Curated annotation (Swiss-Prot):
It comes from Laribacter hongkongensis (strain HLHK9). SUPFAM superfamilies: Acyl-CoA N-acyltransferases (Nat). InterPro entries: Acyl_CoA_acyltransferase (IPR016181), Leu/Phe-tRNA_Trfase (IPR004616), Leu/Phe-tRNA_Trfase_C (IPR042203), Leu/Phe-tRNA_Trfase_N (IPR042221). Pfam families: Leu_Phe_trans. It comes from the Bacteria. The keyword rRNA-binding does not apply. This is Leucyl/phenylalanyl-tRNA--protein transferase. The keyword Cytoplasm applies. It is found in: Cytoplasm.
Length: 233
């Protein structure tokens, strides 16, 4: 049994999350911005399928990536050096989140519902959600979006319409984070893709303790003011 959250009702302690399905903590009827921000500060995130109530999760263990430990595969390193592309931030948030929501042959129904798009677009207007875009020949080719509270970044979803396009954006942002002292990003659940970049699982208690520390610290003021244009000879 999980908690049903009425309006303004607080989240239960994350230690009450189920072990099966791993991390399921609570459910609610809607997804207001205020509750979403509170969730991130508590180490909780929403994930639900179309037609379901909003389900809130805090799995144990938790997948994270430390930007200073980023591993870029050799094949991607060659792409970063030799392909012509431009990486930008916060230039096309709406296009990025809609592209992440688009159905694919492997995923005909996306968890990124119109309600998710609306709420995260509000976070973007508040300066809390961000997008990173890869452009090839002037066209949006890939990217991802996430949420940043203080010095804590929470990755959400990515897409690619050209080979390696989302990986290019991801690698550049992680190196930017490493250079600006951003210690940890939340990857939510284990995937082989993130593990190849150096992601690893840590105990939920360690994750929540780090989140409490990092969300209370201000992010560097110029963190999201950059772009990169790669023009190999």
């Amino acid at each position: 049994m999980i908690a049903w959250l009425d309006e303004d009702e607080p989240f239960p302690p994350v230690e009450q999350a189920l072990t099966e399905p791993s991390g399921l903590l609570a459910a609610s009827a809607d997804l207001p911005v205020s509750r979403l921000v509170t969730a991130y500060r508590r180490g909780i995130f929403p994930w639900f399928n179309p037609g379901e109530p909003v389900l809130w999760w805090s799995p144990d263990p938790r997948m994270v990536l430390y930007p200073a430990e980023l591993h870029v595969p050799r094949s991607l390193e060659k792409v970063l050096r030799h392909r012509r592309y431009t990486v930008t931030v916060d230039r096309a948030f709406g296009s990025v989140i809609r592209a992440c929501a688009a159905p694919t042959p492997a995923r005909p129904a996306s968890w990124i519902t119109p309600e998710i798009i609306s709420t995260y677009s509000q976070l973007y207007r508040l300066g809390l959600a961000h997008s990173v875009e890869t452009w090839i020949d002037g066209q949006l080719a890939g990217g991802f979006y996430g949420v940043m509270i203080g010095r804590m970044f929470y990755g959400e979803s990515m897409f690619a319409q050209a080979p390696d396009a989302s990986k290019i954006a991801f690698a550049h942002l992680m190196r930017r984070f490493a250079g600006h002292g951003i210690d940890m990003i939340d990857c939510q659940m284990h995937t082989a893709h993130l593990a190849r970049f150096g992601g690893r699982e840590i105990p939920r208690s360690d994750f929540v303790a780090t989140v409490n520390t990092l969300t209370a610290q201000p992010a560097p003021p110029d963190l999201w003011r950059w772009s990169h244009c790669n023009e190999p000879a």
